[in-house]
Design a protein with these regions (language model features):
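Hydrophobic alpha-helical transmembrane segments of multi-pass membrane transport proteins
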Residues: 42-80, 84-105
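Short helix-loop junctions at transmembrane helix boundaries
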Residues: 108-119, 140, 167, 187
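Short alpha-helical transmembrane interface motifs in multi-pass membrane proteins
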Residues: 55-60, 91, 114-122, 168-170
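Hydrophobic alpha-helical transmembrane segments of multi-pass membrane transport/permease proteins
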Residues: 13-40, 44-62, 150-162
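Terminal transmembrane helical anchor/hairpin motif
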Residues: 161-188
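A short amphipathic helical element positioned immediately N-terminal to and/or at the very start
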Residues: 3-15, 187-188
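A structural motif at transmembrane helix-loop-helix junctions in multipass membrane proteins
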Residues: 18, 124-164
Length: 188
């Protein structure tokens, strides 16, 4: 029950600060852009957008959440609350994962092909990976500028191999599946 309350609290916090409105605007923009595409180009671009936004935006939203909680002095109060650090992190990951999954499914139905179940698994896995990266970076920094700078290495490692893999340069190379992002993209 406590875990559900932590997730609910995080989702209310996200709603209060406009995360859901931002996602709604992003979805509308993507749907308009996707309406101009067709065929394999559309499928590739939709797959990259599913990976980069619902999955990877978890890193940026997680950082924003942690910075807001730091500025409001919420994090020190967790130490004396009955919520464990494991429940706190799990609540963050699941709350971001839920919104990522919803957005990803909306984008996923824009493709002409693909396994929807595996795509949903990939979206959630990507969200978890990038949310954990966001927690790692978010706990080490004090300002938004620091956060943006510290996420650059995560972005390079998380995006460049995946985009190269997805657009076909190394699509048939099984060794690329050792990269967690490429494995997520394979599912998507």
């Amino acid at each position: 029950m406590r875990k559900a309350n932590v997730i609910k609290g995080d989702m209310i916090f996200q709603w209060k600060y406009g995360f859901y409105m931002l996602y709604f605007i992003i979805i509308v923009i993507y749907l308009v852009l996707f309406s101009f595409l067709n065929g394999s180009v559309k499928n590739t671009i939709v797959s990259i957008c599913i990976y980069s936004d619902p999955a990877a935006m978890g890193m940026f939203f997680m950082g924003a959440l942690i910075l807001m909680e730091k500025s409001q002095r919420i994090i020190p109060s967790i130490a004396v609350s009955p919520v464990t650090s494991r429940e706190y992190i799990l609540g963050k990951i699941l709350s971001i994962g839920i919104i990522s999954e919803i957005v990803g499914i909306i984008l996923m139905v824009q493709r002409d092909s693909g396994n929807h179940f595996l795509c949903a698994v990939g979206i959630f896995a990507g969200s978890v990976i990038f949310s954990l990266c966001g927690i790692i970076v978010g706990t080490k920094i004090e300002s938004l500028n620091q956060y943006i700078i510290w996420t650059i290495p995560f972005e390079i490692v998380g995006f460049v191999p995946v985009i190269v893999y997805r657009i076909g340069f190394l699509w048939n190379e099984r060794i690329m599946l050792l990269h967690p992002g490429c494995s997520v993209m394979q599912l998507i």
